[in-house]
Each structure stands twice: as C-alpha cells, then as structure tokens.
Design a protein with these regions (language model features):
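Flexible, glycine-/charge-rich segments associated with ATP-binding catalytic modules
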Residues: 74-78, 82-87, 91, 96-100, ...
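Alpha-helical phosphate/pyrophosphate-handling elements in metalloenzyme active cores
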Residues: 1-9
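General structural signal for secondary-structure boundaries
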Residues: 6, 31-33, 69, 76, ...
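Conserved ATP-binding N-box helix of the HATPase_c
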Residues: 8-60, 111-112
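Glycine-rich/acidic phosphate-handling loop/turn and adjacent ATP-lid/helix
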Residues: 35-104
Length: 142
C-alpha cells in the first residue's frame, strides 16, 4: 500500500491503514455487519457479495475518503465513509470473545500496533489516526 511509505516505518502502519480502509468500504459504505460478514466468510461468499454491492445503485455511488496530513511532530490519516456509523468502542482493544473469529481485530491492530492513537468521530464513520514522529513501534508479546 503506497500510503504506508509516507511513514517512517511502513511495515508498522501498513496493516492499520489497510484494515481501517477496508472497514470504511466493507462495513461502512457497503453496510456489511459483523455477523453478516462472519456468515459470508463461512459460506465463502464474501467476495461475491462485495462485488454485488459495488454494482448495486444503493451502494455504488458511496465514497470513502482518506486525507493524509504531515505536521512537524506527527502524521495523521483521516478516513471517512458514508455509513450510518457503528459502536466502535468495543473494537478498540483485542477481545478474547472474538479471538478465534475469522475477522474483527483490525481496529485493535490499528490502535495497538500501527498507530499511537486512533479516534473515531461523528457517528463512527470517521476515524483519525495519529503517529508521533520519533516514536518506536510497541514491542510485540511473544
């Protein structure tokens, strides 16, 4: 992902950028909920459903935007989608209840590994990431 190369450590942020962008598209603009995504993955139909919705006039005109800002002390990324929002707080941290689900850890990965901070605004359809310049990636637990 090209945008990751704007950061001092592209490997640190690439997963977070990808996960938050995919969330804006899949869960936001295409309105695929958590349980529905679980079912579609189980039935091996997620890709087909995404393609179907991308062709559906109800969803096809929706846009997700990403704005990258470089400041002297930090880098930030603001991603906005056109969804009705969601309850994002329960996804900020890793949850043992979802540990073995086929998805559902992207926001926590972005929050705990990729960026120093993420913040949701509005109804949950806007996320802002921050990475302080000069910080070191958190150590991963073995």
């Amino acid at each position: 992902m090209l945008l990751a190369h704007a950061y001092p450590d592209a490997n640190r942020v690439v997963t977070g950028i990808l996960e938050l962008t995919l969330n804006a598209i899949e869960h936001g603009n295409l309105n695929i909920g958590y349980k529905e995504k679980s079912r579609l993955i189980e039935e091996e139909r997620l890709d087909n459903e995404i393609e179907r919705r991308l062709s559906d006039p109800l969803y096809s005109s929706r846009e997700a935007t990403a704005q990258f800002v470089r400041r002297p002390d930090r880098l930030s990324l603001h991603i906005t989608d056109q969804c009705k929002g969601f309850e994002w707080r329960k996804y900020l941290n890793f949850d043992p209840e979802r540990a073995f689900d086929t998805h559902g850890r992207g926001i926590a990965m972005a929050n705990k590994v990729s960026f120093d901070r993420i913040e949701y605004r509005g109804n949950g359809n806007q996320v802002i990431t921050a990475l302080q310049l000069g910080t070191v990636a958190p150590a991963l637990v073995a």
